[in-house]
Amino acid sequence: MPSRIPVPRAPLAALIAAALLYGCASSGSKSKSDEAPPSSPLSGVAGRHMVVFPAQYLTTPGGGGSWDVTREGPSLLPILDEELADQLRKRGVNSNWTFGRELSQSADRNGGLAGDPRQLSAQGIRRMPAGDTPLPEPLASQIRTLVALTSARFAVLPIETRVDTRNGERKTAVRVLLIDARTARILWANDIEGPVSRDPAVVSEAMSPFGFRILARELATRFADLVVAQ
């Protein structure tokens, strides 16, 4: 598995903080917590209205260094959605965040007019970095329409979850994007890696519901630590 992409924290933190503060500028004067620089790139988002999209793609190693989307994704990725919601709620992130299941239910109540948050047209941006390049269509409109079902402007997209069980090891990572739905820009992108396990039972069960629950909890915990450290 490729190593985590290095992220220059100070510039990214400043960019995210500026975007968050700009998005809230019309709501009144800033509090001291708004003005303080965040201790991690995502530590400023916990108190905001946020959307966490359902996880999109589950991939395993393919030929020639590629990562292939697996057919187990639709059955296993909702487990990651549950774990992300659970870990963040344990840290006090509640009513101001809309998680994958709630967003899907809201979209379903709209009769499909808002699209399906579980099936975004996101295949082409799996490795897209943060920057000023806007998301392509129809993805930009899909995200904007779905986020508009909530009070949020910013969205977290767990776009790709990688599971590698080669060489008797279980290695995992989830690529997470922080998106400004209004401008369709990626503000932050990173590969969050889970712990490596060499336990034969853990390796063999990685793609079972039980084994995937374990690795999903590990990944969700590491992401939640970036939002609210424990």
Tell me the role of every PLM-derived stretch.
Residues 25-51, 56-62, 135-151, 160-230:
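C-terminal/domain-edge helix-coil "capping" segments
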